[in-house]
């Protein structure tokens, strides 16, 4: 009977609660359920396990409201880079507006921009904190600790007003805490020591840009909860040295993941971790003062290593990678970025010893050439992802071997590889027909021939990016449209592509959700008309620097693509204020429009000011 609830009254709360637990976890799904009726609203509040909020617009009051309404929360994520999205008001209006991505850090006059911080007490910053009323404070953390005593995950990203006092309240009240992210927080040693003393189940700790910490805090934490710690990240903490890592090596014997980015860490610290943490599986290092000696120890003791990432090392040689290849037989992922002294011998050693390798990235290692990658192609049949960035010495024959030997390859990324051309891409397309993702940028020897072969052979391709590839034209996109069902396409700067290529994509890729056609001088309204007809799921489009597109084509596109969420259209001379108004008024889901400020009418600005972004011209 219409208007009469036949089933809701007989469903017990426990059953509805169980149904809510089966949802996808998205906030939109939870909110939709809570709007059914008051009973479902109350039950949904009981079922909510995760909240994500920004830390601007009086976050302390916002946290207090959350604690009152969602009593069973286990995971809290607070990020000061994000604005609070709340319909509630706390004695004043919350108006959307521009927010600073990262707040200005407190520094001494001579401090280095990212690695050093002033040595000031937390009390001396009280007056300064009063000038920032829209940041999460210790009072907010105290409320959080009192309300969410069963908290398991807490992320505080760039909450610069939080101090040791607030962190101590969390530690004392939330003994079940397992994950703690303090990125960009100016907490001190006392707070970290309290976490070590009280949170004996802590497994994951992130200390990126925690400039107020010293060895004292991390040593105390390691002694307190080192037995449970499995993941540790340290970056730009100028006062954390080898002393801390020695404590980690001594007390954190179950550590599996370690990420270090510091010029103050030397061999001694990494050696201690390698010897003490034999269960290490993930190691990421950006430490310019670490040498072969440290990696030789990793190769000796860390036999379970699965992921190794080395960034900007000037002191590593082939000896290090040979040691890794000889011992770390389980290695599945390897990233080498700006390691200038590594040569083909390193990749040959990895290929010989690490046959399970699935992911390889070589970025700016100028002494690594063709023979090293050939060895990978011959010996690592399980390779699924390959990225070659700024590898001028790697030629076609290397990808010939990858095409022959790595049939499971699903993702290939090529950036500024001047010696790789169409023949190499053809070999990959014919040999790796499971390819799903292909990104190519500024590889000027790659043109229509290679991309046509991809369209003919790689039927599972969904993500294609061809940025500033001068030799790629309409014929390539016609083949892609006929052979692949893309979801993501970026052809920015491919000036030979025009309407014909995009029309083929529109007719052959109905599931397209992202499109970047910026800097295509030959693209006109006909392509936009076809995109509107053929790609109804399109959410994001970049049209900047397309000088033939007009308001007419734009109007037809937005009329048909009702799911559009973002549109970039700067430097399009034939798009006027009328076109901008059409986008804003026609797309109910639009979240961002990037355009020149002078093209926005007063009416459009009043109607949709919060979603408009302007090109910065006044430099």
Residues covered by each model-derived region:
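N-terminal adaptor-interaction module of cullin-RING ubiquitin ligase components
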Residues: 1-184, 188-222, 226-234, 238-241, ...
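C-terminal capping region of solenoid repeat domains
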Residues: 85-87, 94-130, 216, 224-225, ...
């Amino acid at each position: 009977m219409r208007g009469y609830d036949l089933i809701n009254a007989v469903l017990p709360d426990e059953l509805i609660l169980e149904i809510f637990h089966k949802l996808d976890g998205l906030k939109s799904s939870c909110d939709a359920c809570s709007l059914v009726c008051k009973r479902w609203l109350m039950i949904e509040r009981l079922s909510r396990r995760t909240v994500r909020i920004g830390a601007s617009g009086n976050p302390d009051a916002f946290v207090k409201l959350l604690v009152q309404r969602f009593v069973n929360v286990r995971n809290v994520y607070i990020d000061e880079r994000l604005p609070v999205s709340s319909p509630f008001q706390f004695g004043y209006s919350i108006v959307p507006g521009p927010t600073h991505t990262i707040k200005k850090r407190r520094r001494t006059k001579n401090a280095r921009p990212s690695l050093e911080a002033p040595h000031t007490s937390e009390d001396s910053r009280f007056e300064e904190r009063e000038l920032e009323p829209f940041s999460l404070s210790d009072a907010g953390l105290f409320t959080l600790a009192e309300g969410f005593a069963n908290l398991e995950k807490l992320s505080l990203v760039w909450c610069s007003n939080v101090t040791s006092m607030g962190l101590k309240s969390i530690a004392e009240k939330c003994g079940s805490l397992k994950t703690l992210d303090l990125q960009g927080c100016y907490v001190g040693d006392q707070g970290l020591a309290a976490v070590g003393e009280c949170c004996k189940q802590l497994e994951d700790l992130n200390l990126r840009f925690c400039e107020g910490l010293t060895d004292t805090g991390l040593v105390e934490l390691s002694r307190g909860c080192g037995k449970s710690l499995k993941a540790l990240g340290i970056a730009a903490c100028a006062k954390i040295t080898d002393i801390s890592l020695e404590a980690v090596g001594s007390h954190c014997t179950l550590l599996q993941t370690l990420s270090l980015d510091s010029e103050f860490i030397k061999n001694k610290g990494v050696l201690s971790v390698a010897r003490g943490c034999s269960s290490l599986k993930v190691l990421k290092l950006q430490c310019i003062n670490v040498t072969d000696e440290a990696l030789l120890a990793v190769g000796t003791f860390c036999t379970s290593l699965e992921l190794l990432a080395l960034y900007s090392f000037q002191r590593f040689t082939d000896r290090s990678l040979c040691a890794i290849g000889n011992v770390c037989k389980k290695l599945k992922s390897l990233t080498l970025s700006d390691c200038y002294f590594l040569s083909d011998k390193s990749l040959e050693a990895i290929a010989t010893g690490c046959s399970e390798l699935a992911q390889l990235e070589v970025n700016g290692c100028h002494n690594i050439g063709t023979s090293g990658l050939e060895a990978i192609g011959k010996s690592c049949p399980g390779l699924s992802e390959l990225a070659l960035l700024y590898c001028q010495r790697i030629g076609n024959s290397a990808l010939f071997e990858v095409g022959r030997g790595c049939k499971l390859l699903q993702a290939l990324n090529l950036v500024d590889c001047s010696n790789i051309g169409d023949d190499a891409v053809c070999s990959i397309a014919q040999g790796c027909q499971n390819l799903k993702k292909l990104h190519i940028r500024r590889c000027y020897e790659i043109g229509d021939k290679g991309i046509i072969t991809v369209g003919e052979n790689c039927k599972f391709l969904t993500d294609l990016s061809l940025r500033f590839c001068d030799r790629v034209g309409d014929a390539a996109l016609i083949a892609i449209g006929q052979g692949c069902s893309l979801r993501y396409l970026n052809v920015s700067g491919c000036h030979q592509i025009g309407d014909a290529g995009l029309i083929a994509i529109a007719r052959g890729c109905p599931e397209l959700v992202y499109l970047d056609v910026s800097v295509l001088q030959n693209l006109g309204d006909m392509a936009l008309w076809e995109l509107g007809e053929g790609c109804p799921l399109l959410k994001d489009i970049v049209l900047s620097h397309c000088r033939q597109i007009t308001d007419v084509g734009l109007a037809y596109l937005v009329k048909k693509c009702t799911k559009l969420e973002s549109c970039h259209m700067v430097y399009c001379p034939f798009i006027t204020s009328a076109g901008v108004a059409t986008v804003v008024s026609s797309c109910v889901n639009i979240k961002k429009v990037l355009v020149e400020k002078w093209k926005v009418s007063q009416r459009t600005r009043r109607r949709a000011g919060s979603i408009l972004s302007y090109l910065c011209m006044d430099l």
